[in-house]
Amino acid sequence: MKTHFDSLKCLLLLSIFTLGGWSGTSIADKVTLDSGGHKLKGTLCRPGGTGPFPAVVYHHGGGGNAIGGSPEDTCRALAKAGFIGLSLIRRSTKPLQGHLEDAEVAVDYIKQRDEVDSGRIGVIGFSRGGLLAWQQAARRNDLAALVIMGVAVNRQLNFADAGNIAAPVLLLVSKNDTGSRYTKGRNTLKFTRRVADALKQAGRDIEFIVYPSFRNDGHTLFFEVRSEYWKDVTRFLKSHL
């Protein structure tokens, strides 16, 4: 039989769990948003308390029914770090057409929530989500922080857009993210260096971290929330949001 003491014990365990420097309970809710007639499912995660809080939207990688990264775990980790987190699963199409609109719907939704400080909005993007985060930051001026992890090697990323990105940028990649089945053999490390160079040449505020080789495939470093990189993500977000 579950007792009142058991309930208190569970709450205590939740309240002392710490990730990214913030301790406290968090709440996760399922959301459904409309984007061009597509019903997109997602997870909204909130720290305990009333806010207003800074907010971060996570753009996952992959395409079609294959999801790259860990959307729900990242959402929960953001809340445990003191942010409102939103991870929205984009339309299940492999071509990227329409995916930027999905990303925009996510940011617009989080920005209008009462418990969110609309002046402190950040975006994290992994792989294809990193490409979308780049495109999104180049077209809007209301983002205060941008984290791009293992960005997809794709000619749709326009290096000339670097000058249009106002938000500070954190670029993350693993040393051995140099070609695998997940990237169709493309060299993500080399491409990320080009992204970093474009931002530097444009005079942008950029931090660029290359992590040591991760297992047999550096792209998989960001498949889960791992302390190797997450501590840098939360440090960066807290310094700008």
Residues of each region from the PLM?
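Short substrate-entry loop that stabilizes the transition state in hydrolases
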Residues: 51-53, 61-94, 178-181
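Active-site-adjacent alpha-helix of alpha/beta-hydrolase-fold enzymes
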Residues: 173-207
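C-terminal catalytic histidine-bearing segment of alpha/beta-hydrolase fold enzymes
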Residues: 202-241
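Alpha/beta-hydrolase active-site loop
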Residues: 94-114
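Alpha/beta-hydrolase fold nucleophile elbow
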Residues: 116-127
